[in-house]
A protein has these predicted regions:
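Conserved beta-strand hairpin/beta-sheet module of binuclear metal-dependent hydrolase folds
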Residues: 1-41, 134-146
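Cap/insert and terminal regions of metallo-dependent hydrolase folds
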Residues: 130, 139-195
């Protein structure tokens, strides 16, 4: 395949009430991330992003928060991160520390169950990382890295990817969130799920 094949999405954009909400920021330009190119295709500049909600601090989710020179990409965005994720060892990693420092003036810390701007609900999805978060907006549930292999993990939520830091908690989160989505008729989207 000379052009390759997309294998995952590491960011989602929702346009609502005149606001642009970004869920995660992908790999970033330094790692050949495509977020800025994709945003421009729908007429969105980084300055037009109002909110960034971070599911967790892995590089394929926060790498796009900074330019290759280490500056803010989303200069006007309010950034929301989980208290548990920020206080975990991941929150002390070099990439996360740089991102948190650059966005300190626009940084907001949330707890699970909090309602964030534009009526986005932060949902406990721990296991993949200590503060891994799913976000619900209306009937859409963005589950981050809750699953890495949907065809396998949907019928067998007890199966874990090597990337899950606490496999027991990851399994419990998967089972709980899958049931929650089913009971509430939610559309589930994730960073490593087919679309």
């Amino acid at each position: 395949m000379p052009d390759g094949m997309p294998s995952s999405i590491s960011a989602y954009l929702i346009k609502t009430n005149g606001k642009n909400i970004l869920f995660d920021a992908g790999l970033g330009q330094k790692a050949n991330g495509q977020l800025l190119n994709e945003l421009s295709k729908v007429g969105i500049t980084p300055e037009q992003v109002d909110y960034v909600y971070i599911t967790h601090f892995h590089g394929d989710h926060i790498g796009g928060m900074l330019t290759p020179e280490g500056e803010k990409v989303f200069t006007k965005a309010e950034v929301y991160v989980s208290r548990l994720e920020k206080e975990s060892d991941l929150g002390k990693g070099e990439q996360a520390v740089k991102m948190l420092e650059k966005y300190a003036d626009k940084l907001h810390i949330f707890n699970f169950g909090d309602r964030l701007p534009e009526d986005v609900l932060a949902i406990d999805a721990v296991g993949h990382t200590p503060g891994h978060t799913a976000f619900q907006k209306g009937n859409l549930l963005i589950v981050g890295d809750l699953m890495h292999a949907m065809a396998l993990q949907l019928p067998h939520p007890e199966y874990c990817a090597n990337f899950d830091g606490d496999k027991e908690k990851a399994v419990a989160s998967r089972k709980r969130i899958l049931e929650y989505a089913k009971q509430n008729g939610l559309i589930m989207s994730g960073m490593h799920l087919p679309y």
